[in-house]
Amino acid sequence: MEVLESGEQGVLQWDRKLSELSEPGDGEALMYHTHFSELLDEFSQNVLGQLLNDPFLSEKSVSMEVEPSPTSPAPLIQAEHSYSLCEEPRAQSPFTHITTSDSFNDDEVESEKWYLSTDFPSTSIKTEPVTDEPPPGLVPSVTLTITAISTPLEKEEPPLEMNTGVDSSCQTIIPKIKLEPHEVDQFLNFSPKEAPVDHLHLPPTPPSSHGSDSEGSLSPNPRLHPFSLPQTHSPSRAAPRAPSALSSSPLLTAPHKLQGSGPLVLTEEEKRTLIAEGYPIPTKLPLSKSEEKALKKIRRKIKNKISAQESRRKKKEYMDSLEKKVESCSTENLELRKKVEVLENTNRTLLQQLQKLQTLVMGKVSRTCKLAGTQTGTCLMVVVLCFAVAFGSFFQGYGPYPSATKMALPSQHSLQEPYTASVVRSRNLLIYEEHSPPEESSSPGSAGELGGWDRGSSLLRVSGLESRPDVDLPHFIISNETSLEKSVLLELQQHLVSAKLEGNETLKVVELDRRVNTTF
């Protein structure tokens, strides 16, 4: 619902649904001129204009759209305190920021808007002739408050409950209106259950959006204050806030001290802020409406100041920690760079030493390989030579022999033959004489010797030994090699035989044969 202002007179026109709830005549019976007028007389025109013209109070219209939470309990609101459930008509009062909460429904929001639209014309009674409008304005407020008690979550029943509120007598409501200061004190006194939630949204809360300075925050319901801001502005930042940061703060008065009646002792910070803002310092309880608004305003400012200091402190701590981390990282980086340089230098030296060792090892290995190659070559040659000598000596008796061995073997065989083998040669010479008989002019000694040779030849024939021709004589070798004379005599014999056979010198050959036989 919207509240429309007239151009000059400031007369507020209400929505048709709210204006039709009751008749103007019925509202006068429920109007409480004495007590409500006393509250309105406490406001000066300047203070009211200052609150209405506050520039940063025009941003709260969105925060009033919060839906009620079904889990929250129903507010225990008295019928005569309907002004505490009212909402600002498009952000005209700083006290309207705490009116919405989880338990609000659309009917309560409508009642708040309607009440504020009647509240300000009532303040204009002092200077303007419009004085009959406030009484009919209070009738719907009373009935709407009763509907909040009976059915807080239904929208169809307010007209039915409104009629019951109209029929109610004034005697039952007047004593409850006199309890207004106590209810206002209950609003200022944040219960322990409310305080943590209220503190959660203080740091991100701008000065114009906090609910402690609004005119519609006069409700005795403490649940309406905490959740008005976090649900619209920064619900994600509400969790990490300290719940007991402001309740235990020495800058604010304890909530339980604002209840009841008696002397009121404020903190130095609250007094200083009140003086700076130009408000009078309250000294006794219960508080009036103006004192309540002023106190809420300065408490909001103090809370904002505390939250700002806390955020700055945390930011400073965070920056200090970051600076320390940067310093530690930079020092560690320098140390690591130095270590890297040292390791690089050692690596270079190790590489140089490794290269030197490799060159030395390669030189030594090449020399040893060469020496080993020459040694193995000589060893192989010696081994081959030894094998050649060994196998050569082994195969001498079976393989081809030199001339000396050829001459030695027949001589060994000839030694085993009887003496007649040599006689055969000489007898062959005698047989050779038969073809050409010698002259008989030889001496008788020689004839006797020839007879001996004839007997030797006859024996040879008897034994079956055949004579060999003279051609074989050069190939026949005397077996006795013990003396050089034997070989020489054999060669001379062969030459002489060949020469004397031609010259008929057989006698000399016979003599040579005899000499040879005697040597054997």
From Swiss-Prot:
UniProt subcellular location: Endoplasmic reticulum membrane
Region described as Basic motif: spans on this chain: 296-325
Record-listed Phosphoserine modification sites: S93, S191
Glycosylation positions in this chain: N480, N504, N517
Residue numbers spanned by region Leucine-zipper: 336-357
Cytoplasmic side: 1-379
Keyword Cytoplasm assigned: no
Membrane-crossing segments per the record: 380-400
Keyword Membrane in record: yes
UniProt xrefs under SUPFAM superfamilies: Leucine zipper domain
Lumenal-facing ranges: 401-520
Region listing for Disordered, in residue ranges: 195-264
Topological relation to the membrane, as annotated: Single-pass type II membrane protein
Record note on modification: Upon ER stress, translocated to the Golgi apparatus, where it is processed by regulated intramembrane proteolysis (RIP) to release the cytosol-facing N-terminal transcription factor domain. The cleavage is performed sequentially by site-1 and site-2 proteases (S1P/MBTPS1 and S2P/MBTPS2). N-glycosylated.
Tissue: Widely expressed with highest levels in placenta, lung, spleen and intestine, and lowest levels in heart, brain, skeletal muscle, thymus, colon and leukocytes. In fetal tissues, the weakest expression is detected in brain and heart.
Oligomer status and interactors: Binds DNA as a dimer.
Chain's role: Transcription factor involved in unfolded protein response (UPR). In the absence of endoplasmic reticulum (ER) stress, inserted into ER membranes, with N-terminal DNA-binding and transcription activation domains oriented toward the cytosolic face of the membrane. In response to ER stress, transported to the Golgi, where it is cleaved in a site-specific manner by resident proteases S1P/MBTPS1 and S2P/MBTPS2. The released N-terminal cytosolic domain is translocated to the nucleus to effect transcription of specific target genes.
Disease: A chromosomal aberration involving CREB3L2 is found in low grade fibromyxoid sarcoma (LGFMS). Translocation t(7;16)(q33;p11) with FUS.
Name under which the protein is recorded: Cyclic AMP-responsive element-binding protein 3-like protein 2
Organism of provenance: Homo sapiens (Human)
